[in-house]
């Protein structure tokens, strides 16, 4: 099947978004509207127009999303072409660039990447070395403050010179936070290591301080596409802007009514103000929801780009809201309702139900309620394979072999 045959599978709004390539574009799309399909087919369309695969940069937020998109593109264009695309998460793509340009920022090209656990371990040792009260300088708080600083492009030097931040730390009774940040960065550099936030910070510094390097990648990436743009933070947004502000060959896809990562620094204004940043930006709205019934499609958020979201499915059951007085009552009610719909109504199998909870800590009481009623269930998620103690030990040995200077 060629690209044109794939385009015939799209509705009119989707097709318009895919074939437009005359300037910057914003695809505003709700859940279930086919925005990933649009991004995938747009890449395939650009390849058909003759763009070399290595000149297309596609940024996603998860490895799973990147993998699925690459598989879909491979089905259209062939595996060899799909493999040559620059497609991946912000962190994976920019770590690749930083390894290529490591000499400009004072890091070895084989620098280690610290995950959240490695970062916490190093911060814990620094807090202990400084003989600070860990009930005041709480590990999670310290890590979060440093992460927020980096995502706002505030280096430890800038942090020390920022009167507002220093005063805020004094008022919060954590005046030595800037010293922890300084020691943390010094130890990372000494070990030849970066954490995830450094990958974004250092890429911005690289592009800011080395115009020739920025120019090289501006010319190299002839088209940039970004998924889930509403979840970008300041550092990510600025990198994309630096790469695209001159040629304007950019397409971002996002849902302005769905921003759930503000605690990580995500800024909804990045998508709301996109049209003002790029002259001549075209906005495409994917308003048809293929996933949900009409009663699930909600359009009451006023702070978003105007669009009429609709579903062609039947109305379905109305959404019901239950307020419980305790977590135990919540678990009991959920289990009882599942039992009622499965047993008494007889319309559903247990596999038709899904329970979503905000934190993993909530699962215990829900599991207990399900077990009491003999309802079978399966937990999805849990501890990542790479977070298991024994796996992290093996990875640490590999790190020592690859980078002997990493003593952390």
Question: Where are the model-predicted features located?
Answer:
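P-loop NTPase Walker
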Residues: 1-109, 113, 215, 269
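Short alpha-helix plus adjacent loop in nuclease-associated cores
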Residues: 93-101, 257-262, 291-292, 381-402
């Amino acid at each position: 099947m060629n690209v044109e045959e794939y385009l015939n599978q799209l509705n009119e709004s989707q097709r318009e978004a895919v074939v437009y390539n005359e300037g910057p574009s914003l695809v505003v799309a709700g859940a279930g509207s086919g925005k990933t399909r649009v991004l995938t087919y747009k890449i395939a369309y650009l390849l058909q127009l003759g763009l070399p695969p290595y000149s297309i940069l596609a940024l996603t937020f998860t490895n799973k999303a990147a993998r699925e998109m690459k598989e879909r593109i491979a089905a259209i264009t062939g595996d060899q072409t799909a493999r040559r695309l620059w497609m991946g998460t912000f962190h994976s793509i920019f770590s690749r660039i930083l390894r290529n340009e490591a000499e400009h920022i004072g890091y070895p090209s084989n620098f280690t990447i610290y995950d959240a656990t490695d970062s916490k371990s190093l911060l814990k040792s620094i807090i202990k070395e400084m003989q600070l009260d860990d009930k005041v300088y709480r590990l999670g708080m310290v890590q979060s403050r440093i992460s927020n600083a980096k995502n706002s492009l505030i280096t430890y030097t800038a942090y020390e010179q920022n009167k507002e931040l220093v005063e805020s730390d004094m008022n919060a009774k954590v005046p030595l936070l800037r010293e922890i940040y300084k020691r943390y960065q010094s130890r990372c550099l000494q070990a030849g290591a970066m954490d995830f936030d450094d990958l974004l910070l250092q890429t911005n510094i690289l592009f800011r301080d080395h115009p020739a390097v920025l120019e090289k990648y501006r010319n190299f990436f002839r088209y940039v596409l970004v998924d889930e743009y509403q979840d970008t933070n300041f550092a990510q947004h600025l990198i994309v802007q630096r790469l695209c502000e001159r040629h304007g060959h950019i397409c971002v896809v996002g849902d302005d009514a769905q921003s759930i990562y503000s605690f990580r620094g995500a800024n909804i204004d990045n998508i709301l103000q996109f049209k003002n940043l790029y002259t001549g930006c075209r906005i495409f709205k994917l308003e048809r929801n293929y996933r949900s019934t009409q009663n699930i499609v909600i359009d009451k958020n006023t702070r978003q780009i105007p669009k009429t979201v609709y579903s062609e499915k039947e109305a379905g059951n109305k959404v019901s809201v239950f307020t419980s007085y305790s977590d135990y009552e919540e678990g009991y009610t959920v289990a009882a309702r599942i039992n009622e719909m499965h047993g008494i109504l007889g319309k559903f199998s247990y596999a038709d139900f899904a329970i979503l909870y905000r934190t993993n800590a909530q699962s215990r009481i829900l599991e207990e309620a399900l077990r009491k009623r003999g309802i079978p269930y399966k937990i999805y998620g849990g501890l990542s394979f790479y977070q298991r103690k024994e796996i992290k030990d093996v990875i640490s040995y590999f790190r020592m072999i690859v980078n002997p200077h990493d003593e952390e």
